[in-house]
């Protein structure tokens, strides 16, 4: 697109000059796009920081994971407080539960379970990893069932029972044993690495 603007020459006479505004417009659009992208990245990083903050602030890695376990129990409580008419709420809570569990699984599978293996607990780490596979299976089945169905809430309760056994085994036996085997320095390094992994998927 071109525009004509009136200008005066050195003798004060009006002259017409043509200016192409396409380049100018493209510059404005590119600048706006870059600004929008930068704001989007800041918002994403801010959201990730908010999601990971409760874990990062909880203390050592085992305390942080116990905090996440408690958050999962609270989501189960909220789900079980719904009825068959609360389908939208159930879907939202299930999505929240899935995200929390997937982030938690990444932290454990990428950081804590390898540390368990290094500490001589390969069989226990393999069993915990296998149980995470069942978690994913439960989530898949729940996402593909009508949330108004009585079978859906029954599946939630079955899922909760199994996942609480898994969490209890970690909190009561395996995690305290691992923490006791590691030096303070190694525990701090494990905590830092775990929080980095959690931040990636928060």
Task: Name these PLM-found stretches.
Residues 2-202:
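Small-residue-biased structural context
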């Amino acid at each position: 697109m071109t525009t004509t603007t009136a200008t005066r020459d050195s003798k004060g006479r009006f002259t017409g000059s043509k200016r192409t505004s396409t380049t100018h417009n493209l510059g404005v659009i590119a600048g706006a796009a870059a600004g929008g992208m930068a704001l989007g990245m800041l918002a994403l990083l801010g959201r990730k920081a908010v999601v990971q903050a409760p874990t990062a602030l909880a203390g050592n890695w085992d305390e942080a994971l116990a905090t996440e376990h408690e958050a999962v129990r609270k989501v189960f409580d909220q789900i079980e407080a719904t009825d068959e008419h609360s389908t939208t709420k159930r879907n939202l809570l299930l999505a929240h539960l899935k995200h929390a569990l997937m982030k938690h699984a990444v932290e454990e599978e990428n950081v804590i379970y390898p540390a368990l293996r290094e500490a001589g607990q390969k069989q226990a780490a393999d069993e915990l990893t296998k149980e995470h596979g069942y978690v994913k299976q439960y989530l898949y089945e729940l996402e593909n069932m009508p949330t108004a169905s009585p079978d859906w809430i029954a599946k939630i309760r079955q899922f909760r029972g199994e996942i609480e056994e898994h969490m209890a085994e970690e909190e009561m036996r395996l995690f305290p044993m691992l923490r006791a085997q590691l030096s303070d320095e190694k525990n701090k390094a494990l905590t830092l690495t775990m929080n980095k992994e959690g931040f990636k998927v928060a």
